[in-house]
């Protein structure tokens, strides 16, 4: 091999050095890098799996949120409807009470008016009786007897009352 220009001991030493270097690189560099790449690949896969789980959880939470929101809306609408019904019932009840009070006040007012009317009529009867007596005395020129006088006055007043 000397003819080719290759030195055999140098070639063997280079082959041994290359194998030793390949072994050392494989042991200390290639395997740790490969292990690191596998670990990284595993972490990425786990992260993707976790991301998918989180995405599914978010979808469930979102669905739960929407369901609860719909339930809250239904409950709110129910509460509003019930409040409106109670308000209508209270309004009707208050109207009945107000009408009853108004009728009662009107009845009391009518009673008072009638009572005052009767008092005024009694007062007018007394005045009318004395005026009639006085007028009759002046016209007749004498006093009427008390018994006849009272009967005549009451008869006249009754006739006037029937005309009104």
Swiss-Prot record:
The chain crosses the membrane at residues 10-30. It is found in: Cell membrane. Keywords: ATP synthesis, Cell membrane, CF(0), Hydrogen ion transport, Ion transport, Membrane, Transmembrane, Transmembrane helix, Transport. GO terms for molecular function: proton-transporting ATP synthase activity, rotational mechanism; proton-transporting ATPase activity, rotational mechanism. It is a single-pass membrane protein. Its main location: membrane. It comes from the Bacteria. GO terms for cellular component: plasma membrane; proton-transporting ATP synthase complex. InterPro entries: ATP_synth_B-like_membr_sf, ATP_synth_b/b'su_bac/chlpt, ATP_synth_F0_bsu_bac, ATP_synthase_B_chain. The keyword Cell membrane applies. F-type ATPases have 2 components, F(1) - the catalytic core - and F(0) - the membrane proton channel. F(1) has five subunits: alpha(3), beta(3), gamma(1), delta(1), epsilon(1). F(0) has three main subunits: a(1), b(2) and c(10-14). The alpha and beta chains form an alternating ring which encloses part of the gamma chain. F(1) is attached to F(0) by a central stalk formed by the gamma and epsilon chains, while a peripheral stalk is formed by the delta and b chains. NCBIfam families: ATP_synt_b, PRK14473.1. F(1)F(0) ATP synthase produces ATP from ADP in the presence of a proton or sodium gradient. F-type ATPases consist of two structural domains, F(1) containing the extramembraneous catalytic core and F(0) containing the membrane proton channel, linked together by a central stalk and a peripheral stalk. During catalysis, ATP synthesis in the catalytic domain of F(1) is coupled via a rotary mechanism of the central stalk subunits to proton translocation. Belongs to the ATPase B chain family. PANTHER family: ATP SYNTHASE SUBUNIT B, ATP SYNTHASE SUBUNIT B', CHLOROPLASTIC. This is ATP synthase subunit b. It comes from Herpetosiphon aurantiacus (strain ATCC 23779 / DSM 785 / 114-95).
